[in-house]
Amino acid sequence: MRKKKLVFIAEDSIIQHVQGWDLSTNDKNAAVKSFSGARIADMENYLKPLLRKEPDAIILHVGTNNIRDESPRSVAEDIVNVVTQIQQDFPSTRLAISPLLPRSDNLELNDKIKEANKILKSFCSSRGLTLLRVTNIDLTCLNRRGVHLNRKGSSLLSNCYADFLKSN
């Protein structure tokens, strides 16, 4: 039997500077699992080996690579469907969804991101799912390419994740 709770942060690489060891505590062992370029359907497959370890909690950050070619509603629905399936298969695993973050490589996508997050918030509220409240992340929190978080953005997001982990 594990002494520390196991927490996975599964993400699509936008949060490349978030470190699991930095989020680990005396009672929680956090590990960041990054899947560069992953789309929502890919993440479903990537999660399978992680779920076999029966984690106590998962923070899921995905959708960044879908938003360019899919509607905001489709992206939000697909994310919620993945989380709902995990809940059904692993009811004791605490789940949280990290919202899509802004990007500066294509500013037009930010309207789609805002809409997807709005829909995601509504879905989460109606289904009793946890959508993390990520504030203060703006275009100054992105690297030069405008897709991934810089150190400032990673620090802000890490703090949000740490708050979730402290309360669970």
Which sequence ranges carry the predicted segments?
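A detector of helix-start/N-cap boundary segments at the beginnings of structured domains
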Residues: 4-6, 143-144
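Catalytic nucleophile-elbow at a beta strand-turn-alpha helix junction centered on a G-D-S/GDSL motif
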Residues: 5-20
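Alpha-helical cap/lid subdomain in secreted, periplasmic
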Residues: 22-30, 38, 42-168
